[in-house]
Amino acid sequence: MRRSFFANAAVAAGVVLLSACGNGTQSTSDGEASSNSAMSIGSCGDLVKEVAELKDGFNWTEGPAWDPSLNRWVFSDVMGDTEYAIAPSGELTTLREKAGYPNGRALLSNGTFVVAQHDRTLNTAKGNGEGFALLFDTYEGKKLNSPNDVSVGSDDSIYFTDPPFGIQGFGPEKAESAHGFSGVFKVSNGTIQLLNKDLATPNGVAISNDQNTLYISDTGTNSIYTLDLSRFQGVPVTVEKFAELMPIDGGGESHGPDGLRVASDGSIWASGKGGINVLKSDGALTCSIPFPNHVSNLAFGGMYGNEILVTSADKVYTVNLK
């Protein structure tokens, strides 16, 4: 497959981050040095050239995105409460500490990132960690649960999931849900709207290339669901089951599905369940890449759009595409 095959997807998945303390960037050698040891490409030999560890020594990595303005990746260490940037060479830069438990991110057309945080906020920031601004922390006057992952449409509409993970111990405070449900939300023209509240643990989210379908992973049911955006007229709509993920042969820790990305050919790359599953637009499995631990998320990017940054437990990996 040609490198240009994935180039469009690389531009469409980013964000920066977050919250309160710690301005200024700092180049560091944080994290252990890259082993650069090649790993299994599983059954994805037609798509993948190589999988290799880029850096380790973190707590729980999440929220990868490519920053095209600085030609580097941005990602979160959720439980380390820190946001990092990392160059393709492995050079690590600390962007923000005591950051608000940042999680998923996605890139807006103006080059800023939308960042979901487990401190119950949705924010924007630049790729260098500056310009932090709050977007939303409430819906209908009540606190959000813990914004988890983000996708941005071609018109800069923002879609995010709001499961309870951050208020169940994976954030700064334990609390009851103010709404009593986990939501999938849309932010557009300064307004926040509820798309769906039927999933108990909505996690990853990604929009289709034609902008008509939202893919949502529900960790607790091991499934991915679709939401028809053309049906949304301001009132929550139902979701339909798209695929159920099975554990990956040779993969390690096998939690339910997590982060999602849609490639330029419409295939869905789903993390979790011991690695990454690549699905066709009809939900059929194309291939799988095993990883030793649960994969929390992935993002297309790189200088030529032919790389993926994978976040998994205490490490980040690169996947080089054919």
Language-model features: locations:
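A short loop-to-beta-strand structural motif that recurs across blades of beta-propeller domains
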Residues: 82-84, 121-123, 183-185, 223-225, ...
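C-terminal motif of bacterial Sec signal peptides marking the signal peptidase cleavage site
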Residues: 18-20
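Short loop/turn segments immediately following beta-strands, especially the blade-tip
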Residues: 227-235, 321-322
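Short, conserved, GDST-rich strand-edge loop motifs in beta-rich repeat architectures
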Residues: 160-178
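Bacterial signal peptide processing site
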Residues: 22-24
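Beta-rich, blade/repeat-based domains predominating
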Residues: 56-72, 98-117, 121, 140-158, ...
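Beta-propeller domains
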Residues: 73-94
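A short helix->beta-strand "capping" segment at the edge of beta-propeller domains
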Residues: 38-58, 239-242
